[in-house]
Amino acid sequence: MTATPGAAADAVRVEGAGACSDGGEEARYASSASLARMLYGADLSERVRRRHPAVCVEHQSGRPVALPSPLAADARRVTVVRAPMGSGKTTALLRWLGEALGATDASVLVVSCRRSFTRTLHERLRDAALPAFATYFDARSYVMTGAAYRRLLVQVESLHRVDEELLGDYDILVLDEVMSTLAQLYSPTMGRLHRVDALLHRLLRRCPRIVAMDATVNAQLVDLLAALRGAGSVHVVICDYASAGFLQRRCTVARRLGARVLAARLKGDAEDGAEDGGASFFTRLRARLEAGHNVCVFSSTVLFSELAARFCLTFTPSVLVLNSTRPAEGDVSRWRDVRVLIYTTVITVGLSFDHSYFHAMFAYVKPMSHGPDMVSVYQSLGRIRSLVDNELCVYFDSSAARPEPVFTPMLLNHVVAEDGGWPATFSEVTNLLCCSFRAACAPAFRGARGLALFPRFKYKHLFERCTLASASDSLNILHALLENNRVGFQLEALRSAHRRGILPLSRGRARRRPAAAADLRALAAGIPSPVSAEGLAEHPAVAAFADKYLRAGGAPPAALEELLRALNGPAARARFVNLAVLGGCLHVPAAAESLEVFAGIYRHYASGEVPVLTEAGAVETAALAPGLRWKPTALFGLRRMARALGLLRRRGGGEADDVADAAHGLTEPAIVELVGPPGGHDYAQCLLEIARCNITPAGVMARGPVVAVAARLSGRGFAQGRGVGLGAAAHAVSVFKVIWEEVFGARLQKSTQTFPGHARVKNLRKHEIVALLDLAGIDRAGRDTHRELYRLLMSHKARFASPKYSLRLPKWGRLLGFAARGPEPGPDAPPEASLEAALARVPALHWPCAAGAVDFCAL
């Protein structure tokens, strides 16, 4: 692709750029090479000085961070600290609290982001001989009130449990890991969002003294505090000190996983894949283990942590695995008793291992829509403060990155930008994509009224979640975060990447990733299952779940086990709930006419608890938190789409469980009609809010340069038909595919059949053949018999040769309770009992009316 800067700019200036077209502050969101660094505070000093001249900005360098004395005559009310991990922030906080509490009998509220961090900080407060602090773990009653809680550590999700009068009397508010604490507002576990948002906002506005610290403090936070407290009350400390354990660490990105090395070792083969020249992830790990070194391994997924453990156990029995399926292990001192430590993001802020004991660290990072974001990965990598050989080897598994062309990488590597720059043919496109994303984020969650903090940081949250669709974007974000902690980052041939116009990590990765992913799946299938399907239905939690969600008569044991195993993952839980809500709205037509009825259905299915079956075979429960996820208007559009597809309906004459869970023979024009015109239902906005998917608008994708650059950054090489944009029909098919796959767990695949519909052509009835002929505009005059019409249809077979698609719901879709009911709702097919009870609480005035009375046919 060749173009001059001006031509490239003209080629891509289309819809979506309005959010950044005014220049100034908004233009910063259009810089694809510096956007990640800006969101994590790399430009904090410059932006604060320019936007808030009255804010005191203090730079510290070459030594651990130090907080300004709380007793100084010129001490400001609000102190904000930005300093890397391992720079001594918590130690400085303890000194500051010791000084403040030594002079006055002040009350203190410490708000944390994680339970583990609360426990660790409580221990450090106790070890520092500070006045006793209570924690919300110790509370004997749900509401914490009285003098016993004047000095309290509480997780942000439990802030509503603090007595409101007590909450207004705290003298000092401490927010260690403040950006992570604010990020919890978007967590699916945040059950009382409006209440917590209001309480935290009030604390920030009224608490006499505030200390907020984080390694990634950005200008958004300072803007908020300056607006609430006045710029003259804010003191910002920016410290660039990093301990030797980070400063000397070097991160190398492995180009290959070495799945064959893993497989060969697990099978006991003598020749275990040494042909990769020692460059792969598992070859390097094997070399360390053979040398008798101590290693730690981070994994984004539980499954890979278990596979890595099996690999390491072939070298040494001294392996400790910490993931969500294993018993919790909060004693970091025990880590020195093992040769191999393997952990997931269960080990994050609050736990730190300071000993120089492990020789090297290995990290398996898999960006995926429901996986940990890159900030969580960065924080987990920072738990090991020192390495003997200062070696960090990272492998990026891009197999879960979205392949659809509507998912476009939008970030350029900042090192390449600083070392000669990216070609304008790249930067003009990616800057536009950043603007398009900014424009999409602006109206997001507008239905969330009464929230003060949630809207302020929604862009950063959506940025962190949406970029997980791209391995390239995720790599660039992690690179910026590690550089923020002064970790050396080595990526083969990175500095010459702009000459090839492709990120080295991506080159060839699209070709290799299916094979590597298949190898891992095959190995995972070999992990024995300790659980039996028998008896699951008798478990109390499973029985209650079945009464609420599943069809009468129960589900077959094997199908129930498969469902409960799937529900152990947050992605499957979300999709299960979404499909239940959709089915409920399909079978209660009033939901399409009344927001209150819709809300009743949504609250019924999206709240409470569901049982899950862990990999260890234990039945546990996972809480559902109805949040700001569904736009009713979008749901109504999806309901219309499902009705048109005939999904979740009983097939005529079938058995009770013969449910339509698939639609076949879908043509591109039919899909375009289902998705609707751009001015209709905004499914792209729906996907952004529900599934955290950033769909590039059709007008942007119609431009050839955008498609070509996205293909290069995604590792697909040059796009087919270079210079040609994505057509409207192809864009609609991609959106349709993402809707059903990401929101409901369905699968859309190309079909091999020639004619539309699910029936085989030789089984078509006469009226069905007539309908097909008329659809194609074929003259059937003089043909009356079935045979004549069939021959006529087959003679025009070429007219039906356009691409066809099949959509199939997940297998557990037919287990849902409403699925076995009649094809049309009515008195003979009422909602299942628990939903009917929930809807009984909806006042009659909110139900649809007919001639001034309740329309009983719609109930």
Curated annotation (Swiss-Prot):
Cellular-component GO terms for this entry: host cell nucleus
GO molecular function terms noted in the UniProt entry: ATP binding; ATP hydrolysis activity; DNA replication origin binding
Subcellular localization, as worded in the UniProt entry: Host nucleus
Amino-acid positions noted as binding ATP in the UniProt annotation, renumbered to this chain: 83-90
Gene3D superfamilies: P-loop containing nucleotide triphosphate hydrolases
GO biological process terms held by the UniProt record: DNA replication
Keywords attached to this entry: ATP-binding, DNA replication, DNA-binding, Host nucleus, Nucleotide-binding
Entry-linked InterPro entries: AAA+_ATPase (IPR003593), Helicase_ATP-bd (IPR014001), P-loop_NTPase (IPR027417), Replication_origin-bd (IPR003450)
Domain of life: Viruses
Stored Pfam families: Herpes_ori_bp
SUPFAM superfamilies according to UniProt: P-loop containing nucleoside triphosphate hydrolases (SSF52540)
Domain Helicase ATP-binding span(s) in chain numbering: 70-235
Keyword Nucleotide-binding: yes
Similarity comment: family membership: Belongs to the herpesviridae OriBP family.
Subunit structure: Homodimer. Interacts with the major DNA-binding protein. Interacts with the helicase/primase component UL8 and the polymerase accessory protein.
Function: Functions as a docking protein to recruit essential components of the viral replication machinery to viral DNA origins. In the presence of the major DNA-binding protein, opens dsDNA leading to a conformational change in the origin that facilitates DNA unwinding and subsequent replication.
Protein name, per record: Replication origin-binding protein
Species in which this protein is naturally found: Bovine herpesvirus 1.1 (strain Cooper) (BoHV-1)
